[in-house]
Amino acid sequence: MKTKFKLLMFSVLILFNYGCFEDGDDNVVASASIKDFVWKAMNAVYLYKSDVNDLSDDRFESNEELQNFLDSYDTPENLFESLIHDRQNVDRFSIITDNYFELEQQLSGISRSTGADFNFYIEPGSSTEIFGIVRLILPNSNASLTGLTRGDIFNKINGANLTTSNLSSLLNNDNYTISLATYDDNETATISDDLILDGDQIVDLSKEDYIENPIYDYRIINQDNDKIGYLMYNGFVGEYNSELNQVFSAFLTENINHLVLDLRYNSGGNIRTATELASMITGQFYNQVFTILKYNESLQSNNQDFLFTNSLDNNNSINSLNLNKIYVLTSNRSASASEMIINSLKSYISVVQIGDQTVGKSQASQIIYDSQNLSRNNVNSGHTYALLPLIAITVNKNDETVPSDGIAPSINIVEKPSNYGLIGDIEEPLLKAALLDIQGSNRLYDQNNNKIYPFDISSTKKYENIMYVKTSKK
C-alpha cells in the first residue's frame, strides 16, 4: 500500500488567509534542499496539482523514492518546469526565482530600469530584423533626462542592428545606446511598403534602481457638456492605494460623469488593490461580491470572496464615483488583474473596452517561500529561491473566467508605429475613440485594417502578467 504524502506541515496554509554558495559540497546540499522545497510546495498549493501525476499525494511509496525522483533533476528550475501543467496552453505564468528579494521589489514597483519602456516590431518585409518604439518615459528616471519622448523610433542598440536573436542580450546591459530612426509609411496605408530609415541621433541610457508610481497620468477632459476623467494606471501596486484614492477625490471634486481607465500597459498586480479600484469606480455595490478566488481541489476551504468595499486597508474612506458605465483602454499587454477589472465589473455595469485583445489570464499567484508554512516568516536562510506558482483562479459573481485567449474589445484599435500619439492627448487614437463614443459620434473609428503587432518579447521588467495575493494589513 502506498504511503500518502499529505505533508501536514503544509496543510496549515494560513498564508492564504492573508497570511550562493561557492563550496562544491554546499552547492550539492543547497540544491537538494531547494528541490525538496520545490516539490513539497507545488504538491501543497499548485492550482493544477490534479493534472500533474508527479504531484499526486500517492505518487511515491517512500521518502527514498521521492528523493530519487528529485535527484533525477540537475537543477531546481528543471524540476519546477517538469511539474508545470501544459506550459504552452494552460499554465503560461508560474515562475521560479533564485532571488526572491528582486521579485518582492518588482511587485512593489521597484526594478532596475532606464525609465524608457519599449514596444518592438518586426520590420516590414523582414522576418528577423526589429525596430523599437518608445511607448513610455517614466518621470524622474534616467530616460527622462535624455529628451526621448513617446513614439520615438530606434533600430540599433550599441550600434548593432536589432534582430530576433540579439535583442534580449542587448537589452540586458546596464548601460547602452539606442540609435534613433524614422518610420516612413510611403504615404500609403499598406504596411508592407513601410521603411525604417537610419537617423543620426544616438541616445545614452543607463539602468538604475527605480521606484515606479503606477499612476502615470490623470486629468479632466471637458467635452461639450461632459466632464471626463482620464487615468493611465500601469500596475496594481498596494503601496499607492492612498494616492490612487486621492485621484478619485479629484474626479469627485470635478464632478466627472465619464471615466476612461487606461490599462493598455498594465500587466497586473495585487487583487485587493484591484478590488479597491473597482470600489472607487462604483460605490453602489458595497459588500457585494466583486471577484471570487478559487483554489485547487484540496484547498477549497481557502476559497475567498473579494467584496466591494468602502475603505482602504488603512481604514480611510474610499472616494467612489458611483458610475454605471466605464471605458477601458487595453492592448495585448493588458493582463491579469487588469482583465479581472473588466471581467468582474461587467457583471454590474457597462464596460466599453477599446484597443486590442488582452492576454488571457484568470489565475492568481502568491510568493511561496521555503519555510514551515510557506510564508516569509522563518524562511530558510540557506538560499533565496522562491516560487510564484498559479495557486487559484478568479471568477466574477456569475462564475465567469477571463477567456484563455483574452478579452476581445468592443472597439478594436491597435497602436500604429506611425502614430502613437501622446498619452492623455485628445488626439491619441485610443483615447480619441473613447471620446467619440462618449459623444455618440457617427464618425468612423480608425479600425487599423492593416495592423502591425508588437514582437513577443519579455519587456524590460523581469516579472510580468502577475496577479497576486498579498497579506492584508487590516
Where are these regions (language model features)?
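C-terminal motif of bacterial Sec signal peptides marking the signal peptidase cleavage site
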Residues: F16-G19
